[in-house]
Structures are given as C-alpha cells and as structure tokens.
A protein has these predicted regions:
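Walker A/P-loop
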Residues: 1-13, 23-26
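Conserved Walker A/P-loop ATP-binding site and its immediately adjacent core
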Residues: 19-42, 51-53, 57, 76-79, ...
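Conserved RecA-like helicase motor-core motifs
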Residues: 43-53, 154-160
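Post-DEXD/H (motif II) to motif III coupling segment of the RecA-like Helicase ATP-binding lobe
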Residues: 90-99, 103-160, 178, 182
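Conserved interdomain hinge at the start of the Helicase C-terminal
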Residues: 168-190
Length: 190
C-alpha cells in the first residue's frame, strides 16, 4: 500500500476487536509518537518506547502494557533484542504483532536494518500470535524475502496500486522559473 494508503487501519481495527495488546514494530520515532497521539486523542490506550527514555520510564511503560489495559505498544526493532523487553513481553497478552516498514528486514531493500532480523526470534516467543508485515515500498524480490525472514507458513500478499488519483505530474516549460513557481504555489491550498 502506498504511503497514506491506510496501512494503520489494517491492524488497528482488528486489534481493537481482539483481547490483549498489539505490538507495533516501527523504525521511526516520529511515526510512533504520531500514532500514539492519534490513538489517545480518540480514547484508545497506546504507548511507545523509544531511545531517550530512562530505564525506569521503559519499565513503567512495559508494566502498564501488562497491567494497564493498553491496546497498542509501539517499539523500535532494536528494542526487541533487550532482555527487559523480552521478559516483560512474555507477561503480556499479545494479540497481534505488526511489523511496519517491513522492507527494512530485507537485505535487498533500500533501507535494510539488521535489527529487523531479530523479529523472527520474537515470533518464537509468541507462538500462535498472528503477524502482519506492512510496507509501502517492496519489489517482488523484497516481498519474498520478508515472508521468508518472518517465517510465514502461508504467503498472503495484499497489494494496492501506487497510482493515486489525487496526484498528478505536469511538466511546464518556462523561461521565468521563479514567477512560475510563485504562481503555482499561489494556486495550491495550504
């Protein structure tokens, strides 16, 4: 699915219908904070653990996920390797494991992150928990690599076209680039 194509709703709605907490692995702190803020704004208990937090803050958030009725926990792939995370995660009732930006797991991907390779180990700690991998950018080779590295038994792929009706590419030839740019910007709302 393309960026802005509704990937978050593909896991948020099912997780809300299930008992337990949904762990979302994502590499971007800004995205974590944005998602948590949006969920909290509509009354859904969500939290994120990211670099810069103290050990005590991390432990508090993890304990809140065990005992506090949280529905969503956003973490970086690097966090999955820590002992404290693994110990606390085993005490959680995890209903869904989501890997966002899953193209980062593939060495064929443009944005490979070695820490994503540890996600398969997390699957071993959460037997029977469904896993969903999401990305807006994956070639067929990367899709296959994602499925192999995450040990998917059944390979289900849902794709949406990158073509967006609300986007257009136009080439304008002009001698006066600055005035043309100012004119175009004046026509664009926002």
């Amino acid at each position: 699915m393309p960026t802005g194509g509704g990937k978050s709703i593909t896991f948020q709605v099912p997780a809300l219908a299930m008992e337990g907490i949904c762990i979302v692995v994502t590499p971007l702190i800004a995205l974590m904070k944005d998602q948590v803020e949006n969920l909290r704004r509509i009354g859904i208990k969500a939290t994120a653990i990211y670099s810069g937090m103290s050990r005590q803050e991390i432990i508090t958030q993890l304990e809140n996920c065990i005992f506090g009725g949280y529905k969503f926990l956003y973490v970086s792939p690097e966090r999955l390797s820590t002992d404290i995370f693994r110990i606390k995660m085993e005490a959680m009732q995890v209903c869904l494991l989501v890997i966002d930006e899953s193209h980062c797991i593939s060495q064929w991907g443009y944005d490979f992150r070695p820490s994503y390779l540890n996600i398969a180990e997390i699957r071993d700690l959460l037997p029977g928990v469904p896993v969903l991998a999401l990305t807006a950018t994956a070639t067929p080779e990367v899709v296959n690599d994602i499925q192999e590295r995450l040990r998917f038994k059944e390979k289900n792929v849902f794709q949406k076209s990158f073509a967006r009706k609300n986007l257009a590419y136009i080439v304008r030839k002009t001698e006066d680039k600055l005035n043309t740019l100012v004119y175009i910007l004046g026509k664009v709302p926002g």
